[in-house]
């Protein structure tokens, strides 16, 4: 029997760390198909912190892709589980036959599904990638992303799967510790990545609430982002008084991030694609409602779980926010499909499907 190989095809330390720790701590002990990884980027202590996994690291996305293609060609029974996939060479290999559809299983993280960049090289590549994605053996994704993908590729199998957000089920009641009165505090974006469209989001918040709310913008990740942070701060201070705007430029530890979320009343996410599920989960867990772009298909997942959804096009005010908080507080968090531990069983199913052990 050929063991399934997992591929992290781009050097995204935060996401890769989350996936590797999840596999090491939760899946590796019960499945031999959860232990082999090929990773783009440096070790960064992963080998030491994930002793249950067999990890191979590659200095570039291209080097990793070449190694995957060589393995795929050498053994056509070898199957790969691709997580995310911000790797042009791998899509081209699937398109050209270097990797066969029966070898290619893909967990959609969001960015590689949507065509949001206006750069010329991206606009030229998107049609090729779209064709290649129609050759995937099976995709795993959120409900909203599965719906989006199926409109383009109705013949490709799709299975529900959620990114393994680090969650403590005992915190499902942490909202009881939160204060829900006074001036609203609004979290804008889930990181410092430009995909959060921070400036547009700040303008939208100002248009809805004026300079009457506290605005918190977490921008400690990714690193080496000071120019963009300064740009966002300047734009924010043109809208909000200094005491109402908090730009967080330092990376935060998980417990500190949870403490920050407990101070918030609303999350505001203007991006038009699925991303930031981890932050959304932690907000929902704390009974903090989220404002989404109507083009972000994750609203379908939230509605399926009977969670209140606010949209950027809604008329928002404190009364609307407090009512959404009340509705969230009435939801039994233990039954939410994309919360831990409920997302575990779909992961076990996904491993069996990708390994060829389940129909």
Swiss-Prot record:
> What gene codes for this chain?
wecF
Function, as annotated, reads:
Catalyzes the synthesis of Und-PP-GlcNAc-ManNAcA-Fuc4NAc (Lipid III), the third lipid-linked intermediate involved in ECA synthesis.
Q: What is the lineage of its organism?
A: Bacteria, Pseudomonadati, Pseudomonadota, Gammaproteobacteria, Enterobacterales
Keyword entries, A-Z = Cell inner membrane, Cell membrane, Glycosyltransferase, Membrane, Transferase
**Chief localization class?**
membrane
Name of the top EC class for this enzyme:
transferase
Q: Does the keyword Transferase apply?
A: yes
Family the UniProt entry places it in: Belongs to the glycosyltransferase 56 family.
Originating species: Salmonella newport (strain SL254)
Q: Which NCBIfam families match?
A: PRK02797.1-2, PRK02797.1-3
Q: State what protein this is by name.
A: TDP-N-acetylfucosamine:lipid II N-acetylfucosaminyltransferase
